[in-house]
UniProtKB/Swiss-Prot annotation:
<dbReference type="GO" id="GO:0051085">
    <property type="term" value="P:chaperone cofactor-dependent protein refolding"/>
</dbReference>
<dbReference type="InterPro" id="IPR020818">
    <property type="entry name" value="Chaperonin_GroES"/>
</dbReference>
<dbReference type="InterPro" id="IPR037124">
    <property type="entry name" value="Chaperonin_GroES_sf"/>
</dbReference>
<keyword id="KW-0963">Cytoplasm</keyword>
<keyword id="KW-0143">Chaperone</keyword>
<protein>
    <recommendedName>
        <fullName>Co-chaperonin GroES</fullName>
    </recommendedName>
</protein>
<dbReference type="GO" id="GO:0051087">
    <property type="term" value="F:protein-folding chaperone binding"/>
</dbReference>
<dbReference type="GO" id="GO:0051082">
    <property type="term" value="F:unfolded protein binding"/>
</dbReference>
<comment type="similarity">
    <text>Belongs to the GroES chaperonin family.</text>
</comment>
<dbReference type="GO" id="GO:0005737">
    <property type="term" value="C:cytoplasm"/>
</dbReference>
<dbReference type="GO" id="GO:0005524">
    <property type="term" value="F:ATP binding"/>
</dbReference>
<dbReference type="Pfam" id="PF00166">
    <property type="entry name" value="Cpn10"/>
</dbReference>
<dbReference type="GO" id="GO:0044183">
    <property type="term" value="F:protein folding chaperone"/>
</dbReference>
<feature type="region of interest" description="Disordered">
    <location>
        <begin position="32"/>
        <end position="56"/>
    </location>
</feature>
<dbReference type="InterPro" id="IPR011032">
    <property type="entry name" value="GroES-like_sf"/>
</dbReference>
<comment type="function">
    <text>Together with the chaperonin GroEL, plays an essential role in assisting protein folding. The GroEL-GroES system forms a nano-cage that allows encapsulation of the non-native substrate proteins and provides a physical environment optimized to promote and accelerate protein folding. GroES binds to the apical surface of the GroEL ring, thereby capping the opening of the GroEL channel.</text>
</comment>
<dbReference type="GO" id="GO:0046872">
    <property type="term" value="F:metal ion binding"/>
</dbReference>
């Protein structure tokens, strides 16, 4: 089944990883103190931006990749009760290889 949203140009739709709820020592982190995660899973990838000659620049990620992205990159969107992040390829920092 394909994802119901199709990103444009060099945009990527990411499902953010869950924020940590507990510290390594076992302390519970309240919701208002949780930091937004900077990683998630790629759900959909746009076709890529066009270069000066009009050719598509291939994307570096694919659906299913786990990625790290910049702290202030992307736009949070809500669609059908779910929260997603739409980021530009330029806001991606790395693919997680585990």
């Amino acid at each position: 089944m394909s994802f119901p949203l199709t990103p444009l140009e060099d945009k990527i739709i990411v499902k953010q990883a869950e924020a940590e709820t507990q510290t390594a020592s076992g302390l519970i982190i309240p919701d208002n103190a949780k930091e937004k995660p900077q990683q998630g899973e790629v759900l959909a990838v746009g076709p890529g931006r066009r270069d000066d000659e009009g050719k598509r620049v291939p994307m570096d990620v694919k659906v299913g990749d786990k990625v790290l992205y910049s702290k202030y990159g992307g736009t949070e969107v809500h669609f059908k009760g779910e929260e997603y992040l739409i980021v530009s390829a330029r806001d991606l920092l790395a693919v997680v290889n585990d």
